[in-house]
Amino acid sequence: MSIQELSTEQEVEMITCVIDGFEVTVPKGTLVIRAAEKLGIQIPRFCDHPLLEPAGACRQCLVDIEINGRAFPKPQASCTIPVEKGMVVKTQLTSPVADKAQKGIMELLLINHPLDCPVCDKGGECPLQNQAMSNGRSESRFEGEKRVFEKPIAISSQVLLDRERCVLCARCTRFSEQIAGDPFITLNERGALQQVGIYEDEPFDSYYSGNTVQICPVGALTGTSYRFRARPFDLISTNSACEHCASGCAMRTDVRRGKTLRRLAGEDSEVNEEWNCDKGRWAFKYEVAKNRITKPLIRDENGQLQEASWPEALAAAAAGLKDAKVGVLVGGRVTVEDAYGYSKFARVALSTNNIDFRARTHSREELDFLASTPTTATYKDIDKADHVVLINFEPEDESPIVFLRIYKQFKKRAIKVSSIASFTSRSTQKLKAKLIKTAAGAEVAAINSITGLSEKSVVLVGERAAETPGALSAVAKLINTSGAKLGWIPRRAGEVGALAAGAVPDLLPGNRPIDNASARVDIATVWGSDSLPTTTGMSTLEIINSDLEAVVVGGVDPMDISPDAKVKLAKKFIVSFEIRQSDITEIAQVVFPVATVVEKSGSFMDWQGKVRKFEAAVEQSLNRSDVRILSMLADEIGKPINLPTVKAARNEFESIGNWDGQIAAMKTAIPLEVKSVKADEAILSSWRNLLDKGSLQDGEENLAGTARQSVVVISQSRASSLSVKESDLVRVSNDYGAVTLPCVIEDIDDSSVHLPRNSLGSQLFRNLGVVSNSIVKVAKA
């Protein structure tokens, strides 16, 4: 536990000790090494990490200690001993004994350590390198041959191990077991033969494996994609935010010559602490994809997209939008500033409320829920919760850092976790969650059955709850009656910010209801507009199915919405804002190239509503942000929105503030009757795996190598009726198509079958035309 965490506890006992002649007062339980840090005294260490349990493995942090005049007989590891009253500590700075002990440990660590510094990825930012200079001998007394191993060993497609570099600090193994709950990497053998390894025939299967690379102090673990690519002093580092989910991770982006070479987890004690998932760490090659769009495109008379100048493209887009009935599909990946730009552009330049960010399965009930039931939970509430309820939410796959925070409390105090799902997943198994087993579409009864929640309880709801009529109404009722805190956690990083920016058909920026005159006056005043459209607009699916003549599309994959979305959109005049060629650009009349996250400044809003600002990491990029292009397009239409820069959009949005007026109560939706199935049928359940066929993961072969195998999950009862055993092929089909995959037998609801939603061999909209809560046939392949 860190000093900061200890200090937040009420009535913590404080203890004063002396370190190198200086008094320091710290909370009871503070480790000596942490108390020294408070004085600015740096004790060398390798195994110590403030977020891992003490191990005392490397022995590099030895210091002289005496308590009430009685000295320890030999130097002690300062990373394992808590401060006590009357304690006097002498570090290497004041004690020759401690200094000699540290030099001796360093000499032993270097006996077999290779001279890889000129080529090692850790060179230039290596604690061993630095501390060998500051706390080691100037010459080695060892004259024998150094131990060598085969190098490197791939413990996964993403992580490589150089065993001779390892100092056995056990940071990687402790992280895997204590933080991620994935004990697939371990210390093998004993004594001089001890080394890091993985279990036989089991690769390092973890969504968080990249953190072991980052916290390794000596370059024993390296990332495949970064190995031998650059030196730290070649890189320009920029603090950034992750664009892959709503967790809100702080990040660091390292760029060389205008190209991103690596990304690291940033430090934010309130959000991701010092961790991130492998998707956030390694999924960035889409920025330099071969099909990247760098110039505006216009479809010519022959139906071919041709490069055009910006004035030509703006004129063509304006001509197609100016007098048409228009909708705006924003997508869930945009920054807050860009979402605000789309929101203002729709209302001012196009005079419509036909705008929606939900590029996924959605419902009108969800709009009512989001407008009337605000998120009140935070990460801190999870840290203090007595009970966490997961509803249509798979934390490890849909918001990995939320899983880590829940798991931390489970390890610390066995927090109670309940999950409404069709079966116990890998992550809920690690949390020892109570499964409220239900088929997809039958969640309402399960939600209504939950009792015993308090104001300290936290209910976390995923975006998939919108797929079951009545589920979100039941959640709202549960929150209102129990007093529990609510967290709505969508998958994509931009959705919470887009909601706040008013990129929905029934809300203006700041969660102001469209049908409230005072709310419209608030926004019209800021925007300098005489009036705003007053009727609730169309949702994403309604826009696609409508007779609208034109649609502005910002980074939307039509296969995330419905199987025939592309065909229906192709009949309309499409203006596309895209990073690279896609299904939408294939049917667009005008395509504008937009900047990626590393090429522009902006912000995301995480699931708890915290704004995560970032600056451009690749400043020499010529690509423009969405909001800047929208502002130019509005000028061309003749209805300016006056948002020429990201900063202008941010300042205007922040000046608006949140709505403090009346909020309409949620309209209760009527749940559907639970489906009944025949013997050869099942109700389809699905969600997206963290590592799947998502477009932002394209080109990441090493990352794809650790994606979990696509399987059909069936019950033992169904396996018996089909006469199949584990790993046999099972065919799931309907009138649209079929998916055939190996089966896994789990304690799943007997009427259900589960498939990954968008993984290799199981892209449900493409294969089956549905994603969940539908009846399918199940047979032995």
Report residues per predicted region.
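Short acidic (Asp/Glu) and glycine-rich catalytic loops that position anionic groups and cofactors
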Residues: 41, 82-87, 191-195, 293-297, ...
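Short, charged, surface-exposed secondary-structure boundary motifs
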Residues: 365-368, 428-430, 444-449, 497-498, ...
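A glycine-rich, hydrophobic/aromatic-adjacent loop/helix-cap motif
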Residues: 458, 463-538, 685
